[in-house]
Amino acid sequence: MFSDERSKYKSWGNLKKQMNNLLCDALKNKISYFYTTYREVHNTYGRATINCERKELVAFSWQIRYEQWEDEYKILNNTNVDIQHLGSLSAVWERQKQIQEELSKEKWMPECILCDGDFIFAVTEYLKTNITSALNSDNYILRVFAYMDRRVGKRTLIKIKEDAEALPEWVKQFYLIRCEAEGL
């Protein structure tokens, strides 16, 4: 999921403004987004958060993601990829990449072990995605943004209740915050 989107956008201020403009009226002064990079640190690592009334609800940090990469590396080394069966080194790399993507999607997304790059990737993706696709996305960060979006009305919130309640707690909390703000 991680993509180096940091090099593809002009400024965080512009993205933040666009995201704030998409917040529903009930959440305008409650929800805030934070993102920073530490330019003096190797690879300009950073930190991103989504806050509600100045309380940090979820954080995306390179430190957490680094621990994830270590775990994935250990799993990949213990995964038997049959080199002879796949035929070429590029096929082996492709299979390892596929295994890594499966690990990331299945384990790390539900546990919210994501980095600042995942957050920026999700923001830039969200701004290009229609609201229906975001509400049904496998990317939980896109769903979080969609739950707080002004384009999602009360009827839609009621329709997606069962789906939202089956999601991990860190995602569900944003659905509940929106419903509470709307009086549902």
Predicted regions and their residues:
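Alpha-helical scaffold segments
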Residues: M1-L184
